[in-house]
């Protein structure tokens, strides 16, 4: 299937922030590749939702932390749409254990999902992006990963490495019309009012300069901008979307 619309692959898009990103990009006119690792029903539900925007949605299940599966996800999307123009590396795992209690197997599993998946998928989608003279690669970090994630050292390592990858891709592929950026979200309890009002979030809310917590619209709106032609001069940046809890200078 060939299409004049741009196509985005959003990993981990069967729920939460990934689902919100899918809605925003569908509203902007992009075809959507929904990916999940286990819950096909949830992924199919998101696909049905985004089709209401008049775009084509394809569900491709698979674990991006497995190289073969990650490559198959990309190949399936490319075969269906002709190319993947936007890659959003949203899938992540954040198991908690002290540094000394983290096994080699768990360490590798975290790095495979949180870091290596971004490498494997970039290698799959970049050739067409370069050939077409346009592309967007968007990844995620996080406030805790930036600070040093207590009880999740492997996550901090992976997210810092993705930041390095982002800068390297921005420099190498910028001349070809491909941008690479990374988003560092703040506290995002989701769009469920009951969940957002949970007492455990009260302290975080009161400490935020905006006196609120993040919603999927905050993330989706930024990614929609980055994927537009107006966002083409934003490249190699870490974008803090946290209401001012973490500031750069």
Mark where each language-model region is.
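Alpha-helical segment proximal to the catalytic Tyr-Lys
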Residues: 127, 171-172, 232
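A glycine/serine/threonine-rich, flexible loop-to-helix segment
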Residues: 175, 182-208, 218, 248-249
């Amino acid at each position: 299937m060939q299409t004049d619309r741009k196509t985005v692959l959003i990993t981990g898009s069967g729920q939460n922030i990934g689902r919100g990103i899918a809605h925003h990009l569908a509203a902007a006119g992009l075809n959507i590749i929904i990916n999940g690792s286990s819950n096909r029903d949830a992924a199919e539900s998101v696909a049905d939702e985004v089709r209401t925007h008049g775009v084509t949605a394809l569900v491709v299940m698979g674990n991006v932390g497995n190289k073969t599966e990650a490559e198959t996800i990309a190949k399936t999307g490319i075969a269906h749409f002709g190319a993947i123009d936007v890659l959003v590396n949203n899938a992540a795992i954040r198991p908690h254990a002290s540094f000394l209690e983290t096994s080699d197997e768990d360490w590798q599993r975290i790095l495979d999902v949180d870091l290596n998946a971004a490498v494997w998928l970039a290698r799959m989608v970049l050739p067409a992006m370069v050939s077409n003279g346009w592309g967007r690669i968007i990844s995620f970090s996080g406030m805790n990963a930036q600070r040093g994630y207590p009880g999740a050292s492997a996550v901090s390592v992976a997210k810092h490495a993705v930041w390095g990858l982002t800068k390297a891709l921005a420099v190498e592929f910028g001349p070809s019309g491909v941008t690479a950026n990374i988003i560092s979200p703040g506290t995002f309890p989701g769009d469920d009012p009951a969940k957002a009002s949970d007492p455990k979030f009260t302290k975080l809310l009161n400490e935020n300069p905006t006196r609120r917590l993040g919603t999927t619209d905050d993330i989706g709106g930024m990614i929609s901008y980055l994927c537009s032609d107006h966002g083409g001069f934003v490249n190699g940046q870490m974008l803090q979307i946290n209401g001012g809890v973490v500031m750069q200078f």
